[in-house]
């Protein structure tokens, strides 16, 4: 594979090297890198490519659904923004209208993250693929993330720290063990 330019291509690269390696586990289900890639490619067939960069808002309950929607946006012209799953509908509608009306999406953006709003209102921060991907080798070395690593995660990908850890883990060809509720007793089973 040539130069990797988005997160789905990153998954494809790992899939080409270790297709049957576990990528994501939650509850009683598990996806290999091949299965994750094929699931996202199947979703992409149902989408139209955006004519220009545009925001795509994701609000899903399960981390796997958040991840697959995020990956589906890659290479399709959409810049995903994962919203907290518990965001009230009226606030969500107002934010989407505001962001769509006031925000020019940078051409090089591959994703946007929403600030927590501690300063009074939520803001969007755009990220390029390279801004995270090029740092993952250093980050993974610091935290000893290898293809054999298994990272236990809990919580929404709307939280930027979780999204970064997911992508760093996947960039190493490692495995994510995800739970939607905080209960370390569940991790013992995985």
Residue ranges and their predicted role:
Residues 11-13, 64-82, 139-141, 160-172:
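Hydrophobic alpha-helical segments in the ANL/AMP-binding
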Residues 133-150, 158-190:
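Conserved AMP-binding/adenylation subdomain of ANL enzymes
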Residues 60-61, 81-96, 174-190:
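ATP-dependent adenylate-forming carboxylate-activation enzymes
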Residues 2-7, 19-22, 100-114, 130, ...:
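Conserved pre-ATP/AMP-binding loop-to-beta segment of ANL
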Residues 2-3, 12, 17-50, 89-93, ...:
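Conserved AMP-binding/adenylate-forming core of the ANL superfamily
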Residues 110-137:
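Conserved AMP-binding A3 loop
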Residues 45-86, 153-156:
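Conserved AMP-binding/adenylate-forming
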